[in-house]
Regions:
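Alpha-helical linker/hinge and terminal dimerization helices associated
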Residues: 42-43, 64-84
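A short LG(V/I)-centered, amphipathic sequence patch enriched
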Residues: 40-57
Length: 94
């Protein structure tokens, strides 16, 4: 599971639409589907129930959602902390 897969999962979970999520992520729908399929394969669970007209989270998808949100938020917070530390180091060395 990687950061990009988490972002793809979270975006599809929010939009419940692969085409809309792909547009939002500036990628193609097949590329987005590949990321979701890879995540599903790694977790050995279907995360979305797909029909020709609807997308819905499965029970596994609903179970993953709060953890994916926490993980992604943690990644963003870690980046911010490192960036802040890096900026502070440059200020004190000047």
């Amino acid at each position: 599971m990687n950061e990009h897969q988490l972002l793809c999962f979270l975006t599809v979970s929010r939009t419940l639409n692969f085409s809309a999520a792909a547009r939002e992520l500036y990628c193609t729908q097949p590329a987005l589907s590949y990321q979701i399929r890879s995540l599903e394969k790694e977790l050995d669970a279907a995360l979305f129930r797909r029909t020709t007209t609807q997308v819905a989270l499965t029970e596994a998808g609903r179970a993953l959602l709060p953890h994916a949100e926490d993980l992604y938020r943690g990644i963003l917070n870690a980046r911010t902390a490192v960036s802040y530390t890096h900026l502070r180091a440059h200020e004190t060395c000047a």
